[in-house]
Amino acid sequence: MRKLVLFLFICSTSATFAQENWGDLKKNKLTMKEIPPVWPGCSGSIKEIDACFNQQLSKHIMSNFKYPTLEYKENIQGRVVVSFKINTEGFVEITGVTGGNKGLQEAAKKNILKIPQLTPGMMGGKAREINMRVPFNFKTNK
């Protein structure tokens, strides 16, 4: 009988301790940081990395912008939006292209596909895909 009483006492105290250690939802709040993709050469805080990424992306688009010859000659203009994702390995994958004609769309896609391999975005310590959209305005000024 003593062994049974001792066993019940141990079980009840361990259950009580387990409840105290668990706490409530307010004490167990989980916050996960989202880290944006990192362009080669960018570093610092998350804000600095994000600002550097945007600056480098703009610089990349401007330096790789090529107006297709045929569309330029025929004064074909338009706005093209390229949707893409930066995958978990840091490579760009085109997910969609809208606007403009095929020539303008191809030029915009080629520009985006020239983005170098990046350090992928992170969430909770794991690489994750980041979706993005970039508009291209093709104007001949003729």
Sequence positions of predicted segments:
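N-terminal signal peptide c-region/cleavage motif recognized by signal peptidases
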Residues: C11-S14
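Charge-biased low-complexity segments
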Residues: V5-L6, T16-K142
